[in-house]
Amino acid sequence: MKVLNRHNRKINTTPGIAASILDSLSGPEDRLWPHENWPPMQFDGPLGEGARGGHGPIRYRVEKFTPGKKAVFRFEPEGLAAGLDGIHYFEITPFDGHVLMVHVIEARCGLVMWLKWSFVIEPLHDALIEDAFDKVENRIAGKQVKSSLWSPRVKFLRNMIARKRRREEKKRAA
C-alpha cells in the first residue's frame, strides 16, 4: 500500500533566511523542528548524508542533504517506522516573492503498517509538521502569529503514549 503525505506552507521570508532555518535542523539551535512539544530530531553526527537517527521511536538516516534546499531521510527498518519503505523530506522553494516550505512522506507498506500509519502515526505526524511550520512563522515574525490546535485524537494519542512511557519508567525503576 502507498503512503503519501504532503504539507506545505507559504512563508513570508527570503530564501536565505529559510535556507538557514532548514540547515539548523537537528542542531543545537534548531529553528525548524518543534522539539519543545515533540521528541527532538537527533542524529549520530551533524546533519549530512549517512547520519543515522530520528525522532522518538521513528528511525531514519539522512539519504541526501542539499544545504539550504532539501533534506531527504530514508526510513530504517526498526522502531515505529519498521514496515515503512520510503523517504520523507523537507524542501525550501522560492515562490512568488516568498518561500514555500514543504514536507513530504512517500513510502510503501503492508496492510498492518498502513493501519498503524492511518490510525496512530499520521495524526501525530500531521500535528508535528504543522507545529514545525508554526515555529518557523512565529520565529520569523518575532512573535506568536500562528498556533495550530491539536485535534482531540492527537491529544488522546499523546496522552496514551505518555501513560505508557510512565508505566515503563516505573517498571525500570522497580
Regions found by a protein language model. Name each.
Residues 27, 54-58, 64-71:
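Short, charged/polar surface micro-motifs in flexible loops or helix N-caps
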Residues 4-6, 55-60, 83-89:
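Short, surface-exposed coil-to-beta transition loops
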Residues 45-55, 72-80:
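Short beta-strand segments that buttress and anchor functional surface loops
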Residues 77-138, 145-149:
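Beta-strand/loop substructures that line and gate deep hydrophobic ligand-binding cavities in soluble
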